[in-house]
Amino acid sequence: MNNLINDIKKELRANMNGVASAHARQTEDYRVNWGVELPRLANLADEIAENRFSSTPSEDISPRALAQALWNESTRECKILGCMLMPAEEMDEEVCDIWAESIRTEEIATMFCFYLVQKLPYASTKAFEWMAREEKMLQNCGYLTLCHLMRKYPLSEEAEAEFLDQAGASLDNRYAIKALQIYASLSEDNARKVKKVADYL
């Protein structure tokens, strides 16, 4: 596993974007950030999956184990690759919560929800659980996940009421605002409901 992780890091360094990396160091968002752009990371994730797991590997390393090992690294690119490579069907709820609770940056929260959480069979459950938490980053994950889900599936009447209640109490969170905007854009009736929430507040 260590050899594979080191090989991946070498490839990441070779694709380093110096300007983005320098900016990240100034903001101290990450312990290590090579500034590799997302399209290249997506291509690299495909290459890893094709080359490492397309045939019987020489080492007994599963995609899940590799994704977890990458997530454990204090490196922007490794964490994003971990989100891209984790098989959704193998991500149990307990591990999902552990990952979510360890997130420290909005970018990683965004990548986590986009590449992984929205694909999970319990994504809706997690979204509403996290929205109700006090921790800001978990709230972010909840609203980000719901943003993706609402574009694909209608909310039940009960879920709709809970969402409007939670989001209405979290208007200082820009992801709650984004979720309300997406919800309002889906129908005129939804837009009226969002307006009522805003007028009430």
What role is predicted for each listed range?
Residues M1-L201:
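Alpha-helical scaffold domains
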